[in-house]
Amino acid sequence: MTMTTAAVFGCTGAVGSQILATLLAIDTFPSVKTISRRLPNVQSPKLEAIEEGDSSKWGGMISSFSPKPSVVFNAVGTTRAAAGGLQNQWKIDHDLCIENARAAKEAGVKTYVFISGAGIRGFVARYLPFSKMKIGVEDAIKDLDFEHAIILRPGMIIGRENPKSALLENIVGGLNKLGQGIQDSLGQDQTVIARAAVAAARMADEGKAPSKYWVVEMADIVRLGRDEWKE
């Protein structure tokens, strides 16, 4: 394995916190870096966590890490309500994510992993604000031409402490009683999504990624993050 250092943006969110926990639990990454507005609620000798309230500085801090990360995971995301309106959400979910990707490319990051969303390029869905933000980031990452770019498109995220749509997420989360496949087609557990992101990054490093720009849809998230997951 040549991949030694990983960095995580969005390390305190639902999926990002699980990506961080997964990275700290396996031997593949002896060094893990994070930059966030508040420090993650975990500690490890492997972890270097930087608290920076000004997110505009995050991208530029990548090149200051030693050793420099060879893979960056971007799980940054918020809601319109939490951001205080669509304009502020756009600054975070679109502008900030693109800025971080550009900074990662300039810093020599080889593999960039982005947590996007399922169905965003559908005939109707592509015109929704959420989809426009995610599509913009996906396209920017593709244009940056990383050695490996990995886009995960999960469905509804299950297992969050503070669900964005508690009733709907509880309904989807309970569908496994009718059959795991039904639930898998609509939403995935946050831990499964995180493990799929890490597994895909490992595959890219091992030369096993199916393509340079790899879109991991829901079925492959379940396969990589649950059915075939190995620590």
Curated annotation (Swiss-Prot):
GO terms for biological process: import into nucleus. Pfam families: Epimerase (PF01370). Residues 1-46 form a transit peptide. GO terms for cellular component: mitochondrial outer membrane. InterPro entries: Epimerase_deHydtase, NAD(P)-bd_dom_sf. It is a peripheral membrane protein. Keywords: Membrane, Mitochondrion, Mitochondrion outer membrane, Transit peptide. It is found in: Mitochondrion outer membrane. The keyword Ligase does not apply. Belongs to the FMP52 family. This is Protein fmp52-2, mitochondrial.
